[in-house]
Design a protein with these regions (language model features):
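Short, surface-exposed loop/turn segments at beta-strand-coil junctions that are enriched for proline
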Residues: 126-132, 144
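Short, conserved beta-strand segments of beta-strand-rich sandwich/propeller modules, principally
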Residues: 72, 133-137
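Extracellular and select intracellular beta-sandwich modules with Ser/Thr-enriched
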Residues: 146-152
C-alpha cells in the first residue's frame, strides 16, 4: 500500500519542501500522484515545472551574483489540461533555524526585490542589496486550486 508522510502544509527548511499543499491550500503534483495511487482519480492536475534557471545556470552550479546585478529567472512550466497559469515569485533569505526533526519553524520574512519584468514564468529582477544566501521561489497556479512550486538557491557576494 501507499501512505502519505504529511497531508498538509509545513514550513520546514523552506515553505515548499515537505507539504503537499501550499500555504493557501492549493494542491501540488504530489496530490496527483497520491490520488493516482489511491483512487485512480481524474481530478484537474497541478501544473508541472520542467526547468528553472537563474542567469542560464542550474541550481547545481552554485550561482553567485553581485549586489544590484540584473538577474534573469527562466522557467519551463506547463499545465496538463492547458489551463492558463498565474505566476508569483518571492525571495527569502536562506533558513538557518536549528530545530530537531519536524519541530516548528517560523516562516521567514520576504526580501523586497526590484522587479524589472515578469512575463510567462520568466522574471527579471535586481539582486538583493545585502550579502548572503537566498532562495527565489516560483509558484504557478492554474486557477483550479492547483500549484507548482520550485526554488533556486543563490548567493549575493
Amino acid at each position: 500500500g501507499s501512505y502519505c508522510f504529511l497531508w498538509g502544509y509545513k514550513q520546514e527548511e523552506t515553505p515548499t519542501w515537505y507539504g503537499i499543499f501550499s500555504k493557501d491550500g492549493y494542491a501540488t503534483q504530489s496530490v496527483d500522484v497520491l490520488n493516482g495511487n489511491w483512487k485512480n482519480s481524474n481530478r484537474n492536475k497541478a501544473p508541472v515545472i520542467d526547468e528553472i534557471l537563474l542567469n542560464q545556470k542550474t541550481r547545481y552550479e552554485s550561482v553567485k551574483i553581485s549586489k544590484k546585478d540584473i538577474c534573469e529567472l527562466s522557467t519551463k512550466i506547463y499545465d496538463p489540461e492547458g489551463d492558463k497559469l498565474n505566476y508569483y515569485f518571492e525571495v527569502l533569505p536562506e533558513n538557518y533555524q536549528k530545530v530537531e526533526g519536524g519541530d516548528f519553524q517560523k516562516s521567514l520574512e520576504k526580501v523586497n526585490i526590484n522587479i524589472i519584468s515578469n512575463e510567462n514564468g520568466n522574471l527579471k529582477f535586481k539582486a538583493p542589496l545585502k550579502r548572503g544566501a537566498y532562495r527565489i521561489f516560483v509558484y504557478a497556479d492554474d486557477g483550479q486550486k492547483n500549484v507548482a512550486t520550485a526554488n533556486f538557491p543563490f548567493y549575493v557576494k
